[in-house]
Design a protein with these regions (language model features):
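GST-like domain detector, emphasizing the conserved glutathione-binding G-site
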Residues: 1-155
Length: 155
């Protein structure tokens, strides 16, 4: 551990302007709306807004496992969110204020439920459908340990 006690973290972290590189706008360290754009909504109860990235694919695979297991309430519409700036649209930021994919909206609840971050979506769906999530506390702890591990690990 450093013995330098002179460093004081800033009260508010500020992002230094991007360097203009090719990928500088897709994963900026800020979030929030940059433009107005509504998101499409399909006919199924679950609306998935994502892209075929490792985190996006996790949710799609789980939804397909639910459907293969006969959980018809897991029908969903998938919408492509290109990470070229679309994730900063007003519609997407309303669902995920962090401006990251994936995000899910469940229209079966009294008010639509928004869920963002792949691990949160996986846990939400597992609990909603009582699928692949043990009820036994020890087994559940083991399951959640692996879920959280994969979230923090590189693909």
């Amino acid at each position: 551990m450093s013995k330098n006690l002179e460093y004081v973290p800033p009260y508010v972290w500020k992002w230094e302007e991007e360097n203009g590189g090719e990928f500088s706008k897709i994963n900026r360290p800020t979030s929030g709306q940059t433009h107005e754009q509504a998101l499409p909504v399909g006919k199924h109860p679950l609306q998935l807004y994502s892209l075929a990235t490792p985190n996006g694919v996790k949710v799609t695979i789980f939804l397909e496992e639910l459907l293969a297991g006969g959980y018809m309430g897991a029908e969903y519409d998938a919408w492509l969110i290109k990470i070229n700036g679309t994730q900063f649209s007003s519609g997407f930021v309303d669902i995920n204020p962090n401006s990251k994919i994936p995000a899910l909206v469940d229209h079966t609840t009294k008010r639509p439920t928004r869920v963002f971050e792949s691990g949160a979506i996986l846990l939400y769906l597992a609990e909603k459908f009582n699928f692949m999530i043990p009820a036994d506390h020890s087994k559940r702890a083991e399951c959640l340990s692996w879920l959280f591990w994969q979230i923090g690990s590189a693909p």
